[in-house]
């Protein structure tokens, strides 16, 4: 969505300037994938597979079942990581998209006023 907002912003704000190409799209997609994998690495590193929650259960349906848990070194590490994810994966793109579309809105409003 961020890349779509950037493309729309560029085409409306600077129509004769930079135009995104297929190569730009592929580079943008590759960067997004690298960032997604990098931001998920702590989950991969701190995952623990255990049958601990099912050890005291007597139901046959839960025997031999396993669960993945996040086992960060401390609660402050987990809190810092999840807060960073929230900021980088939600608020960052949301603000960026908002700014792009706000600039588009201002430009289109000015064009409309010029035509009136």
From Swiss-Prot:
Residue positions the entry lists as glycosylated: 56
Keyword Transport: no
Classification via SUPFAM superfamilies: Family A G protein-coupled receptor-like
Keyword presence, Zinc: no
Alphabetized Pfam families for the sequence: 7tm_1
GO cellular component: neuron projection; plasma membrane
TM helices/strands, residue ranges: 1-6, 25-45, 82-102
Positions on the Extracellular side per record topology: 46-81
Swiss-Prot/TrEMBL keywords: Cell membrane, G-protein coupled receptor, Glycoprotein, Lipoprotein, Membrane, Palmitate, Receptor, Transducer, Transmembrane, Transmembrane helix
InterPro entries (UniProt xref): GPCR_Rhodpsn, GPCR_Rhodpsn_7TM
Broad class of where this protein is predominantly found: membrane
GO MF, any single term: neuropeptide binding
Cytoplasmic side: 7-24, 103-116
Topology in membrane: Multi-pass membrane protein
Compartments reported by the entry: Cell membrane
Similarity annotation: Belongs to the G-protein coupled receptor 1 family.
Record function comment: Receptor for neuropeptide Y and peptide YY.
Protein name, UniProt field: Neuropeptide Y receptor type 1
Organism in which the protein naturally occurs: Ovis aries
């Amino acid at each position: 969505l961020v890349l779509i907002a950037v493309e729309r912003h560029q085409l409306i704000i600077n129509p004769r300037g930079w135009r995104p190409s297929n190569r730009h799209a592929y580079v943008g997609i590759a960067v997004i994938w690298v960032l997604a994998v990098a931001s998920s690495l702590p989950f991969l590193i701190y995952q623990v597979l255990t049958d601990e929650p099912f050890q005291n259960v007597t139901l046959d349906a839960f025997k031999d079942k396993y669960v993945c848990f996040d086992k960060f070194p401390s609660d402050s590490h987990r809190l810092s990581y999840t807060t960073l994810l929230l900021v980088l994966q939600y608020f960052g793109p949301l603000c960026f998209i908002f700014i792009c579309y706000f600039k588009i809105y201002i430009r289109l409003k000015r064009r409309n006023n010029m035509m009136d």
